Structure formats: structure tokens, C-alpha cells
């Protein structure tokens, strides 16, 4: 998994799979879901991230037991 925040575009992208994107769907305004040819979720993009996420430049990562 890879998380990227682009200050220039104010977008936060979370990539779950390293696959070619076949289709994108704007689930809600400013929330874009990308899928591969098999319908698997590849990535999630949040537009205007600084207004939607408290601190887009910081990430906390946890693994549940």
C-alpha cells in the first residue's frame, strides 16, 4: 500500500494494488475510486484533501492483532 499527498493539487491518493486502472468512479463528490479490469479496487483519491482530512501530510499506521 502506498499513500501520497500532493500539495500542488491538494489530493491524497492511497494505492492498494499495483495494477492498471481500467475504470474510475466518483463515489461521492471529490472521492474517486479506481478499479482494475477485474473490478478490484486499485486506489482511492481524495480531492481537496486539506479540507476533508485533518492532517493530509501526516499518516498513522496500525496493524490490528
Task: Give a label for each model feature.
Residues 1-65:
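Small, basic N-terminal interaction modules of short regulatory proteins
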Amino acid at each position: 500500500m502506498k499513500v501520497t499527498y500532493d500539495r500542488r493539487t491538494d489530493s491524497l491518493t492511497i494505492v492498494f494494488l499495483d495494477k492498471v486502472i481500467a475504470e474510475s468512479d466518483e463515489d461521492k463528490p471529490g472521492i474517486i475510486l479506481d478499479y482494475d479490469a477485474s473490478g478490484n479496487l486499485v486506489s482511492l483519491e481524495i480531492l481537496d484533501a486539506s479540507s476533508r482530512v485533518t492532517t493530509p501530510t501526516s499518516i498513522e499506521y496500525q496493524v490490528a492483532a
